[in-house]
Amino acid sequence: MANNDNKHRRSMSMLLYIAVAIFVYLLLSNTLLPGLLRQQIQTVSYSEFLNKIESNEVTKVDLNTGNRNIRFTTGSGDSEKIFETTQFPNDSTLVQTLREHKVDFSASIPDNSANMLMYALIQYGIPLIIFLGIGFFINRSLKRAMGDDGPSMNFGGGFGGLGGNLGRSSAKEIKGEDTGITFKDVAGQEEAKESMQEIVSFLKTPDKYKEIGARCPRGALLVGPPGTGKTLIAKAVAGEAGVPFFQIAGSEFVEMFVGRGAAKVRDLFKQANEKAPCIIFIDEIDAVGKRRDASLNSNDEREQTLNQLLSEMDGFDNHKGIVVLAATNRPETLDKALLRPGRFDRRIPVELPDLKGREAVLQIHANDVKMEPGVDLSIVAKSTPGASGADLANIINEAALRAVRFGRRRVTTEDLTESVDVVIAGAKKKNSVLSEHEKDVVAYHETGHAIVGAIQKNDAPVTKITIVPRTSGALGFTMQVEDDERYLMSKSQAMDEIAVLCGGRAAEELIFGEMTNGASNDIERATAIARAMVTQYGMSDKLGMVTLSQQQSRYLGGGSSLTCSEATAEEIDAEVRRIVEEGHQRALQTLKENRFKLHEIAHYLQKKETITGEEFMNILKRENTFAPVDKNINDEGSSTPSEE
């Protein structure tokens, strides 16, 4: 029965398409094509026709007695031209004149039936076939682009759809049990899982909520940085509840055809109503849910789609068990109407995992990989502060790839530690060979960071120093890992961190008496900390406890814009320079006081290229036994290389 209905609908759509095509072409052919044909035959006056006969230009004349028109030809071959004029009534001398000038002429009453039929076929038939062919090709291309390869011309309920699926939602439907994901597969997000448990409970046992008069939250907005598991949590909710799961990206709603986005929203909620209870998950909802305004950059199609989404979220019966989940990392751009209670009732933060969470995430991904006995994942967790779940999954995968590369059947601790370096700084550059002088500069630079970091009381312990160039562009790096997770930063800790960042440049100035561009990233980070101290943390003695900037795109690492006068902005710049310079001077002083250790560790690092934190601390703590033989440091802190 359904097949017969589809065939009937396709036949009607085909007839409608042909009818519209014929109408459009007839309209064009009766206005445009006759004019083009007439442009090939020049119309002249009767007197000009007689003049051309007198001057012997006319070679052939056709006297049409049916419409009293005269069509004549001048010239021959490539120079032949056709003219047309209206015969002057009662001109009895025309035939005599044509004979005198020896012009070929003919006169007849034409039978136009055959000519008219041929003319109609040429003028209307062939172009119409071409027109229909082009239209069919465009229609088929649109249907293929929308995922329908069928040869039919189904217009989705009307010719205006221009393609069978343009008004149909492209959401992927997954059965709850087919997601293969439950809360056991989600780690490091215990608070988010706890918030979602109530939604799962309602979807599984709605009667106990209806009995007391409670309604299920219509929607929940998952907010957090990229890679933290927002989509994974949404799938886990569907897996736990065992209900259908509709997944669609926000960008898939907005189309090139006006009104198609709103139609897709209607179709999505129609499908959800048919499969209720179920979950609708809209990923990156900011693509369609941006704040509406009256600016010139406003998008009417996107706003129309958003209005339809708001209407649907208000209109569906929440007792059916339809829950809308959405994810975004730009919550500040969302329309306020979308965030009000009754639409997205809950806003659930999905933040970067802490130390315990990172270890749990690593363990989940490690379950799919063969590991050597005794591999300590806590070391990796400590080495990756600020890493997302996606970063940690990548670390485990990189370790497995490295194990295969070296012919091992199990992942070792070395594979894991090296994969951390790959994710953080990139892979080793095997073909990059530094000159002896550059290698010397990099060794002192990284040692400067490490010594200043080890001396500062508030800084994290050094765990690794390397001067092996990486694909990220770094010629070396110093890794420091906190023993415990740190959630607050005091002013003294911020100043110590700036001093550590200035340690590399200070070592270059102290030992070589000049500076390189190797400290560019250190300067950038030190400046960012100092500016945050002044404009966000209220740690400036001069400007006091005020907020002077507004952060943008917090979860995407966006910058901040100043919210102060130009005069205050100048004071901010001066204060930032003062704080960074203070850290620079502290680093210089620390290295002057430990200059022999600076030489000893730098030379040791230059020989081994990579040393552990334990090796570094052993050299730093033992008595001074190293005398610099290749550098001479004067009392003012400048230095010059000694002659070899």
UniProtKB/Swiss-Prot annotation:
Q: Cytoplasmic compartment: which residues?
A: 1-13, 139-644
Q: Name one GO biological process term.
A: protein catabolic process
* Keyword terms: ATP-binding, Cell membrane, Hydrolase, Membrane, Metal-binding, Metalloprotease, Nucleotide-binding, Protease, Transmembrane, Transmembrane helix, Zinc
Q: What is the lineage of its organism?
A: Bacteria, Bacillati, Actinomycetota, Coriobacteriia, Coriobacteriales
Q: InterPro entries recorded for this chain?
A: AAA+_ATPase, AAA_lid_3, ATPase_AAA_core, ATPase_AAA_CS, FtsH, P-loop_NTPase, Pept_M41_FtsH_extracell, Peptidase_M41
Q: Which residues lie on this side of the membrane: Extracellular?
A: 35-117
Please list every transmembrane segment annotated in the UniProt record, as residue ranges: 14-34, 118-138
Instruction: Give the similarity note.
Output: In the central section; belongs to the AAA ATPase family. In the C-terminal section; belongs to the peptidase M41 family.
Active-site residues, as the UniProt record annotates them: E446
Primary residence: membrane
Listed binding positions for Zn(2+) are: H445, H449, D522
Q: Which CDD domains match?
A: RecA-like_FtsH
How would you summarize the oligomeric state and partners of this protein?
A: Homohexamer.
The gene name on file is ftsH
This protein's GO cellular component annotations are: plasma membrane
Alphabetized GO MF terms? ATP binding; ATP hydrolysis activity; ATP-dependent peptidase activity; metalloendopeptidase activity; zinc ion binding
Among Pfam families, the record links this protein to: AAA, AAA_lid_3, FtsH_ext, Peptidase_M41
Q: How is the cofactor bound?
A: Binds 1 zinc ion per subunit.
Stated membrane topology is: Multi-pass membrane protein
This protein's cofactor list reads: Zn(2+)
Binding residues for ATP: G224, P225, P226, G227, T228, G229, K230, T231
Role of this protein: Acts as a processive, ATP-dependent zinc metallopeptidase for both cytoplasmic and membrane proteins. Plays a role in the quality control of integral membrane proteins.
> What is the protein named?
ATP-dependent zinc metalloprotease FtsH
Can you say where in the cell this protein is located?
Cell membrane
* EC number(s) reported in the record: 3.4.24.-
